[in-house]
Amino acid sequence: MSKPIVLSGVQPSGELSIGNYLGALRQWQQMQDDYDCQYCVVDLHAITVRQDPKALHEATLDALAICLAVGVDPKKSTLFVQSHVPEHAQLGWLLNCYTQMGELSRMTQFKDKSARHSNDVNVGLFDYPVLMAADILLYGAHQVPVGSDQKQHLELARDIATRFNNIYSPEAPIFTVPEPYIPQVNARVMSLQDATKKMSKSDDNRKNVITLLEEPKSILKKINKAQTDAEMPPRIAHDWENKAGISNLMGLYSAATGKTFEEIEAQYQGVEMYGPFKKDVGEAIVTMLEPIQEEYKRIREDRAYMDAVMKAGAEKASERAAVTLKKAYEAVGFVTRP
């Protein structure tokens, strides 16, 4: 029996955070035995916001090495760089012609990003969701792990797939209509200084973010200065409405140690100050990230291995993507190249 196909991607823009790890990359590793996984470093998406070429080059290799370091196995999963598989851009153009301007103008992420990058509101940023649809539909993905910020884009991909199928092949659909896969994670990873906002690797205030490759001393310092509250006596309780800062730290501690919120509350019942709890949270994060950082350094220094992974992944991805692209091209009437 064939496994359900899953596709997910990670952007090589900025340093990956523990939010990226707990919200996505850790699930990538865990899903490999039960799903046919397609994982990509989405460098085509990254350039919808202006990038320094050298920084993008290094960030792409960094992201690939991190994927490998967290446990993505190229023998179990297809791991590749998006721009190495030209079918993504090719199908993206075709799908543009089956997407309405009004649909794209309603995308909230475009509104948010265009407001933040008002000096460079380019067509690629507007068109981002169509390329994402191509990413998904090329591989016949049954499920796509998405956070709340990407659910609208997945809905658009479903609409495009359904529209194309209804026009050209209602009896034998060319595209699989994907469903969302909502990962069950312990931690809602929020900003360290403002726990009402999601932790973002692109946050200009670096005190809000812990990166996967961050030095232990820096991690401990940031957690020590993280938002808590002024309740007296101090109380460790998981209550997002009234104790967002503490709840955020509890989520991180739970994710790093495997302890439940109930166990954490019992462990720190009757504390006289938040300092010891913060110290334990910081040390738990350092312990969680240490093996990942060590493996990352080993892999990042082995460029021959990384090249081999990229080459094999691109070839495997292209082989599958080419089949879908050929069907779509034939459906619209393109002449097959002799």
Swiss-Prot record:
One of its GO terms (biological process) is tryptophanyl-tRNA aminoacylation. Keywords: Aminoacyl-tRNA synthetase, ATP-binding, Cytoplasm, Ligase, Nucleotide-binding, Protein biosynthesis. It comes from the Bacteria. Homodimer. This is Tryptophan--tRNA ligase. Belongs to the class-I aminoacyl-tRNA synthetase family. It holds the Pfam family tRNA-synt_1b. It is an enzyme of class 6 (ligase). Its EC number is 6.1.1.2. ATP binds at residues 11-13, 19-20, 147-149, 189, 198-202. Its main location: cytoplasm. NCBIfam families: trpS. L-tryptophan binds at residue 135. Gene3D superfamilies: HUPs, Tyrosyl-Transfer RNA Synthetase. It comes from Aliivibrio fischeri (strain ATCC 700601 / ES114). GO terms for cellular component: cytosol. It is found in: Cytoplasm. Catalyzes the attachment of tryptophan to tRNA(Trp). A motif ('HIGH' region) lies at residues 12-20. One of its GO terms (molecular function) is ATP binding.
